[in-house]
Amino acid sequence: MAKEYSRTQRIGDQMQRELAQLIRREVKDPRVGLVTITAVEVSRDVGHAKIFITVMGQDNAEDIAQSIKVLNAAAGFLRMQLAREMKLRSVPQLHFHYDESVVRGAHLSALIERAVAEDNQHVAAAEPEDTKE
Protein backbone atom coordinates (compact mmCIF):
# COMPACT_ATOMS: atom_id res chain seq x y z
CA MET A 1 0.00 0.00 0.00
CA ALA A 2 1.30 3.45 -0.88
CA LYS A 3 2.48 5.69 1.91
CA GLU A 4 0.20 8.64 2.51
CA TYR A 5 1.66 12.12 2.58
CA SER A 6 0.06 15.19 4.05
CA ARG A 7 -0.57 18.25 1.93
CA THR A 8 2.26 20.15 3.64
CA GLN A 9 4.70 17.32 2.86
CA ARG A 10 3.69 17.33 -0.81
CA ILE A 11 4.05 21.11 -0.96
CA GLY A 12 7.44 20.88 0.76
CA ASP A 13 8.67 18.25 -1.70
CA GLN A 14 7.57 20.31 -4.68
CA MET A 15 9.08 23.47 -3.17
CA GLN A 16 12.38 21.64 -2.68
CA ARG A 17 12.53 20.68 -6.37
CA GLU A 18 11.42 24.09 -7.65
CA LEU A 19 13.70 26.09 -5.33
CA ALA A 20 16.73 24.01 -6.30
CA GLN A 21 16.17 24.96 -9.93
CA LEU A 22 15.31 28.59 -9.18
CA ILE A 23 18.40 29.15 -7.03
CA ARG A 24 20.63 27.56 -9.64
CA ARG A 25 19.06 29.57 -12.51
CA GLU A 26 18.06 32.89 -10.97
CA VAL A 27 20.34 33.72 -8.03
CA LYS A 28 23.48 35.14 -9.63
CA ASP A 29 25.14 36.44 -6.46
CA PRO A 30 28.76 35.18 -6.28
CA ARG A 31 28.55 34.99 -2.47
CA VAL A 32 26.17 32.05 -2.81
CA GLY A 33 28.07 28.86 -3.50
CA LEU A 34 26.69 25.55 -4.72
CA VAL A 35 23.53 25.30 -2.64
CA THR A 36 21.87 21.97 -1.92
CA ILE A 37 18.40 22.01 -0.41
CA THR A 38 18.29 19.12 2.04
CA ALA A 39 14.78 19.58 3.45
CA VAL A 40 11.75 21.85 3.44
CA GLU A 41 9.37 22.04 6.40
CA VAL A 42 6.06 23.75 5.66
CA SER A 43 3.83 24.93 8.52
CA ARG A 44 0.33 23.47 8.74
CA ASP A 45 -1.26 26.75 7.66
CA VAL A 46 1.16 26.96 4.70
CA GLY A 47 2.20 30.41 5.90
CA HIS A 48 5.88 29.71 6.50
CA ALA A 49 8.48 27.32 5.15
CA LYS A 50 11.87 26.49 6.65
CA ILE A 51 14.34 25.62 3.92
CA PHE A 52 17.39 23.72 5.15
CA ILE A 53 20.46 24.01 2.95
CA THR A 54 24.08 22.99 2.74
CA VAL A 55 26.69 24.88 0.74
CA MET A 56 29.36 22.92 -1.08
CA GLY A 57 32.87 24.29 -0.77
CA GLN A 58 32.10 26.62 2.13
CA ASP A 59 33.23 25.22 5.45
CA ASN A 60 33.74 28.27 7.63
CA ALA A 61 30.84 29.84 9.49
CA GLU A 62 31.26 33.32 7.94
CA ASP A 63 30.83 32.10 4.35
CA ILE A 64 27.85 29.96 5.28
CA ALA A 65 26.23 32.84 7.18
CA GLN A 66 26.81 35.10 4.16
CA SER A 67 25.11 32.59 1.85
CA ILE A 68 22.14 32.31 4.23
CA LYS A 69 21.91 36.10 4.43
CA VAL A 70 21.90 36.45 0.63
CA LEU A 71 19.24 33.75 0.23
CA ASN A 72 17.04 35.30 2.92
CA ALA A 73 17.40 38.66 1.15
CA ALA A 74 16.32 37.00 -2.12
CA ALA A 75 13.42 35.18 -0.41
CA GLY A 76 10.80 37.62 -1.71
CA PHE A 77 11.97 37.22 -5.29
CA LEU A 78 12.15 33.43 -4.93
CA ARG A 79 8.68 33.38 -3.38
CA MET A 80 7.28 35.32 -6.35
CA GLN A 81 8.93 32.89 -8.78
CA LEU A 82 7.59 29.94 -6.78
CA ALA A 83 4.07 31.37 -7.04
CA ARG A 84 4.35 31.30 -10.83
CA GLU A 85 5.72 27.76 -10.89
CA MET A 86 3.58 26.06 -8.24
CA LYS A 87 0.18 27.67 -8.81
CA LEU A 88 -0.72 27.78 -5.12
CA ARG A 89 -3.28 30.14 -3.69
CA SER A 90 -0.73 31.38 -1.16
CA VAL A 91 2.99 30.63 -1.22
CA PRO A 92 4.66 30.40 2.20
CA GLN A 93 7.20 32.92 3.41
CA LEU A 94 10.66 31.44 2.95
CA HIS A 95 13.18 31.17 5.79
CA PHE A 96 16.58 29.70 4.94
CA HIS A 97 18.56 27.78 7.58
CA TYR A 98 21.86 25.92 7.47
CA ASP A 99 21.45 22.14 7.82
CA GLU A 100 24.01 21.00 10.35
CA SER A 101 23.01 17.35 10.13
CA VAL A 102 25.50 16.74 7.30
CA VAL A 103 28.39 18.14 9.34
CA ARG A 104 27.21 16.26 12.42
CA GLY A 105 26.97 13.04 10.41
CA ALA A 106 30.50 13.46 9.03
CA HIS A 107 31.80 14.08 12.55
CA LEU A 108 30.07 10.96 13.90
CA SER A 109 31.39 8.92 10.98
CA ALA A 110 34.94 10.08 11.73
CA LEU A 111 34.50 9.15 15.40
CA ILE A 112 33.27 5.68 14.46
CA GLU A 113 36.17 5.15 12.04
CA ARG A 114 38.65 6.23 14.71
CA ALA A 115 37.09 3.87 17.28
CA VAL A 116 37.21 0.95 14.83
CA ALA A 117 40.86 1.70 13.98
CA GLU A 118 41.78 1.82 17.69
CA ASP A 119 39.90 -1.43 18.29
CA ASN A 120 41.76 -3.09 15.41
CA GLN A 121 45.07 -1.91 16.90
CA HIS A 122 44.15 -3.43 20.27
CA VAL A 123 43.17 -6.72 18.63
CA ALA A 124 46.39 -6.78 16.59
CA ALA A 125 48.47 -6.04 19.68
CA ALA A 126 46.72 -8.79 21.67
CA GLU A 127 47.11 -11.50 18.99
CA PRO A 128 50.90 -12.08 19.33
CA GLU A 129 50.49 -12.63 23.07
CA ASP A 130 47.82 -15.28 22.44
CA THR A 131 50.00 -17.17 19.95
CA LYS A 132 52.98 -17.35 22.36
CA GLU A 133 51.02 -19.31 24.96
Curated annotation (Swiss-Prot):
Annotated InterPro entries: KH_dom-like_a/b (IPR015946), RbfA (IPR000238), RbfA_dom_sf (IPR023799), Ribosome-bd_factorA_CS (IPR020053)
Stretch forming the signal peptide: none
UniProt keyword list: Cytoplasm, Ribosome biogenesis
GO BP terms: maturation of SSU-rRNA
Presence of the UniProt keyword Cytoplasm in the record: yes
Cellular compartments annotated: Cytoplasm
Pfam families: RBFA (PF02033)
Record-level Gene Ontology MF annotations: ribosomal small subunit binding
Function: One of several proteins that assist in the late maturation steps of the functional core of the 30S ribosomal subunit. Associates with free 30S ribosomal subunits (but not with 30S subunits that are part of 70S ribosomes or polysomes). Required for efficient processing of 16S rRNA. May interact with the 5'-terminal helix region of 16S rRNA.
Complex formation: Monomer. Binds 30S ribosomal subunits, but not 50S ribosomal subunits or 70S ribosomes.
Family as reported in the entry's similarity comment: Belongs to the RbfA family.
Protein name (Swiss-Prot/TrEMBL): Ribosome-binding factor A
